[in-house]
Amino acid sequence: MPRKGPAPKRPLVVDPVYGSPLVTQLINKVLVDGKKSTAERIVYGALEGARAKNGADPVATLKKAMDNIKPALEVRSRRVGGATYQVPVEVKPGRSTALALRWLVGFSKARREKTMTERLMNEILDASNGLGGAVKRREDTHKMAEANKAFAHYRW
């Protein structure tokens, strides 16, 4: 096994249009087959569409959507004496952002609108209003954690 330890975190380059690291992370999550310019077109189009629809700052809308999607708790499997328990644990800030972006893009892809730009825009707008599949996923995750609160003492 290598003994160098974990790879250092590289600084995230902020996007040139909005100057937000969150937008850069979203672009990287939308990215497919290394087509960065296509991913940028999709994300920027979705944010501009969100600005046109609700008239607010698109980055603020995205941040509000992310706050509504980010999970505070999740369950992790823990084996104790032959039984597997779903143990509720707090989610670290970096992981909660990563999960929120993953859910946002995943539920955008599953939507029925014609273009990915429209799907992403509508999912962001829905999430900022507390609706949509990504917000439902967060609520389901929190419900699972609440239901398994009895096993919280197995936390590590």
From Swiss-Prot:
InterPro entries: Ribosomal_uS7, Ribosomal_uS7_bac/org-type, Ribosomal_uS7_CS, Ribosomal_uS7_dom, Ribosomal_uS7_dom_sf. It comes from Micrococcus luteus (strain ATCC 4698 / DSM 20030 / JCM 1464 / CCM 169 / CCUG 5858 / IAM 1056 / NBRC 3333 / NCIMB 9278 / NCTC 2665 / VKM Ac-2230). PANTHER family: RIBOSOMAL PROTEIN S7. The gene is rpsG. Transmembrane segments: none annotated. One of its GO terms (molecular function) is tRNA binding. GO terms for biological process: translation. Pfam families: Ribosomal_S7 (PF00177). GO terms for cellular component: small ribosomal subunit. Belongs to the universal ribosomal protein uS7 family. This is Small ribosomal subunit protein uS7. One of the primary rRNA binding proteins, it binds directly to 16S rRNA where it nucleates assembly of the head domain of the 30S subunit. Is located at the subunit interface close to the decoding center, probably blocks exit of the E-site tRNA. The keyword Ribonucleoprotein applies. Part of the 30S ribosomal subunit. Contacts proteins S9 and S11. PROSITE patterns: RIBOSOMAL_S7 (PS00052). The keyword Metal-binding does not apply. Keywords: Ribonucleoprotein, Ribosomal protein, RNA-binding, rRNA-binding, tRNA-binding. CDD domains: uS7_Bacteria (cd14869).
